[in-house]
A protein has these predicted regions:
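Non-catalytic substrate-recognition/targeting regions of SAM-dependent transferases
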Residues: 107-120, 136-207, 215
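Conserved SAM-binding motif I beta-strand of class I
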Residues: 247-252
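C-terminal catalytic and target-recognition region of SAM-dependent MTase-like enzymes
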Residues: 333-395
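Non-catalytic accessory regions of SAM-dependent methyltransferases
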Residues: 1-121
């Protein structure tokens, strides 16, 4: 008889699971039975042999990512049910059913009770990204569930996990199409068109999580002179142009990002002379710019991906925000963000507070921003709340 692949917890270490937290850390494990390989589904038992969860096992600090707290098989029907539940939430909240929007996140990891899995929808293409070996091993079942749930609306499924999986010599994690391949890379977000580069772009090709914040920015753009730092695809710039900005300057250190921004401007506002893009380091640009702008967006990449880099990240946020607050015109509005999971809302707000004091400007908070509804936060997994932003009025 084959021994069940299972994890036995140390005494008392089931408490976080009883509160439905989806991670089991390696230090909580008494022993592992059945010789599971990385990415296998294991059954988790308390020290007195009570069933408590089932999930993917992986070498590392997070040893098991919980898929279910029910004693149920992890089979094709499981994946079908979970993706159907995720899609139903997007339908009921109006995210996936809008005629002017076919760009959204279908699965957001722990927020959809599928830790280690991201699925973004770009028109007729679904991009699957695994952040755990278990989700990599399950990718074909996940793709089958996508096909079943989205039916005729999805013609292409692209798998993009080369940069998100831990190094393992014995797994093939090459990016590529699971289904289709002759895909248009133009997607629509709230009536605006964007070139999505899921083959070579960051993340799955687009920062879907800023959709509602871009829409808010549009309401402030009319007649303003706008600077979009770390522009990447130019999302904020495109919304600002539609909102009636007088001028829009987009800055990114990557020339590829500038090319993509210019292409997105051209597809929405061909020949619009209000927009100029600069391939330049953000700090260098801020140092040399005059007091030319009254609406600035700071949306940098994650300054800290690990807790040991938190201190340097907070220094970076202070320096960046202080320079922007110093340079923005009186009556200016600053949209400033952090997407670092290890930077808490309190950390970020304190960094911006310190920046305002350094710049010696009177500053008021107009909005406190976060991720949109298609990036839900599991109430039992507060670590999932990673995006934080402030909209500031600078006198």
């Amino acid at each position: 008889m084959t021994m069940e692949k299972s994890v036995i917890l140390k005494r008392g270490k089931e408490e976080s699971l009883q509160r439905f937290h989806p991670w089991i850390f390696s230090g909580a494990i008494q022993r592992i039975d059945g010789k599971p390989e990385e990415g296998d589904v294991v059954t988790v038992y308390t020290n007195d042999n009570r069933f408590i969860a089932r999930g993917h096992i992986q070498v590392g600090s997070i040893a098991v990512r919980v898929l279910t707290f029910k004693d149920e098989p992890i089979d094709q029907e499981f994946w079908n049910r979970r993706l159907a539940t995720a899609y139903d939430m997007r339908e009921r909240t109006g995210i996936s059913s809008r005629e002017d929007n076919n760009t959204y996140r279908l699965v957001h990891g722990e927020g959809d009770n599928l830790p280690g899995l991201i699925i973004d929808i770009y028109g007729e293409t679904a991009v699957i990204q695994a952040h755990s070996v278990g989700m990599h091993v399950s990718r074909m079942q996940i793709a089958e569930a996508v096909k079943k749930i989205l039916k005729e609306t999805i013609k292409n499924i692209y798998y993009k996990s080369e940069t998100t999986l831990p190094y393992k010599a014995d797994i093939n994690k090459d990016n590529g199409y699971i289904m289709g391949g002759n895909a248009s890379n133009i997607s629509t977000e709230y009536g605006l068109k964007f070139h999505i580069d899921w083959l070579r772009g960051q993340k799955t090709g687009f920062f879907v999580d800023q959709r509602e914040n871009r829409s808010l920015l549009e309401k402030y753009a009319k007649g303003r002179k706008l600077l979009n730092m770390f522009c990447y695809t130019g999302g904020f710039s495109i919304y600002a142009l539609r909102g009636g900005a007088e001028i829009v300057h987009s800055v990114d250190s990557s020339s590829k990002a500038i090319d993509l921004t210019n292409a997105n401007v051209e597809i929405n506002f061909p020949g619009d002379t209000r927009h100029t893009a600069y391939a330049e380091d953000a700090f260098d640009f801020l140092d040399r710019m005059g007091n030319n702008y009254n609406l600035i967006i700071l949306d940098p990449p994650a300054f800290a991906k690990h807790r040991d880099s938190l201190r340097n990240a907070l220094i970076g946020y202070r320096r960046l925000n202080a320079k922007a607050i110093e340079k923005i015109q009186p009556g200016g509005i600053l949209f400033t963000f952090s997407c670092s999971q290890v930077v808490s809302k309190e950390n970020f707000r304190t960094a911006v507070f310190t920046a305002a004091a350094m710049a010696k400007r009177n500053v008021r908070i107009l909005h406190q921003l976060t991720q949109p509804a298609d990036h839900p936060v599991n109430i039992y997994h507060p670590e999932g709340e990673y995006l934080k932003g402030l909209v500031l009025y600078v006198e």
